[in-house]
Regions:
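Bacterial N-terminal signal peptides
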Residues: 10-20
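Bacterial N-terminal signal peptides that target proteins for export
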Residues: 1-11
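Sec/Tat signal peptide C-region and signal peptidase I cleavage site
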Residues: 20-26
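N-terminal secretory/targeting leader peptides
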Residues: 13, 27-121, 129-132, 136-337
Length: 337
């Protein structure tokens, strides 16, 4: 009888421990509201991805954690948003991964022209050890890399003339992301690069301060560049992953359960956002044509010429990050075997 009583008591204590542990786990998640800064407007796949991210965070936290989205660059330029994130006044920023080269030089690799042959290659690299290693380097700069989303393959637009061959680019004043490699490749094509924050781009195109720009189709449509640009050339010259980054200053105040909610939600939203982006591409081109854009596409021979003209740019910019270039090429080599 005594033995039975002891077993019953032990079982009761074990059940109580499990129950209390479950309650404690649920109570670990506290109420939070986080701001999310994005450059693109509502309706763009990245903002749709942000909406899914917010939905997932709310669901996984039982409604305790909330993401407030600020699309369209209303919280400032990418550079200003990163600075605010480092200071802890903005918690989350979604931005072109290459822009982070101003913080960690290795991120310049993501702006190398003709790096990825297709989106499948890009996914494998950024989701694998290479991409995670680069995101880990952000911590020393006050940022936590949660996931990679997608902006996509970049195309060229301008208001001057159709682009059918490499020589057509010569003399065009093209807005570029403010970093060295983008300035260099436009110069290599005899164009005139104009570094400019994305939030200033539409007005610069409208006022003819620049002749053209280069961005994925989704960006061209969502930001209505067709209103101020007549010619679109399909060049696929660069693929842009997007980094979802979190303020380390705020991250360090979160507990393990809260961090897991954010990390899991960011990863799930990545798969969703990439699919939305890729599903939209064909329809986006049709919409741009209907909006009046004249579309041209580089032939295989012209694309080969474009690659050749950019090789010295890749060599020059690779000298500053030799180990990163070596690791990237090794990853791509494995994927292509």
């Amino acid at each position: 009888m005594k033995h039975l009583l002891q077993k019953t008591l032990a079982l009761a204590l074990a059940l109580a421990a499990v129950t209390s542990s479950g309650i404690a786990s649920a109570q670990e998640i506290r109420e939070h509201a986080f701001k999310v800064s994005q450059a693109n407007p509502k309706g763009h796949p990245l903002v749709t991805g942000g909406e899914k991210f917010a939905e997932l965070v709310a669901a996984k936290s039982g409604g305790k954690m909330k993401l407030n989205l600020f699309p369209g660059g209303v919280l400032g330029s990418d550079a200003a948003s990163v600075s605010a994130l480092q200071g802890g006044t903005i918690e989350i920023v979604v931005l072109n991964s290459g822009i982070l080269a101003s913080q960690v030089k290795d991120f310049a690799i993501y702006d190398f022209p003709f790096l990825f042959a297709n989106a499948k290659e890009a996914d494998a690299v950024v989701d694998g050890p290479f991409g995670q290693k680069l995101h880990a380097k952000l911590q020393e700069k006050g940022m936590v890399g949660l996931a990679y989303w997608e902006l996509g393959f970049r195309q060229m637009t301008n208001s001057k003339r159709p682009l059918n061959k490499v020589e057509d680019i010569a003399g065009l004043k093209l807005r570029v992301i403010p970093n060295t490699i983008n300035i260099d490749w436009v110069k290599a094509l005899d164009g005139n690069p104009t570094p400019l924050a994305f939030t200033e781009l539409y007005s610069a195109l409208e006022q003819k301060a620049v002749d053209g720009q280069e961005n994925p189709l989704s960006v061209i449509l969502a930001n209505k560049f067709f209103e101020v640009q007549k010619y679109l050339a399909i060049t696929n010259h660069q693929y842009n992953p997007q980094s979802v980054i979190f303020s380390k200053k705020v991250w360090d105040t979160l507990n393990a359960a809260e961090k897991k909610v954010l990390q899991d939600a960011a990863n799930e939203a990545a798969k969703y956002e990439r699919q939305v982006s890729r599903d939209a591409d064909a329809g986006t081109l049709d919409q741009l044509k209907k909006a009046g854009m004249q579309v041209s596409e580089f032939s295989a021979a012209e694309t080969a010429k474009l690659r050749e003209r950019m090789k010295p740019v890749i060599t020059k910019n690779g000298e500053a990050i030799p180990d990163t270039v070596k690791d990237m090429l090794a990853e791509l080599d494995k994927l292509r075997k």
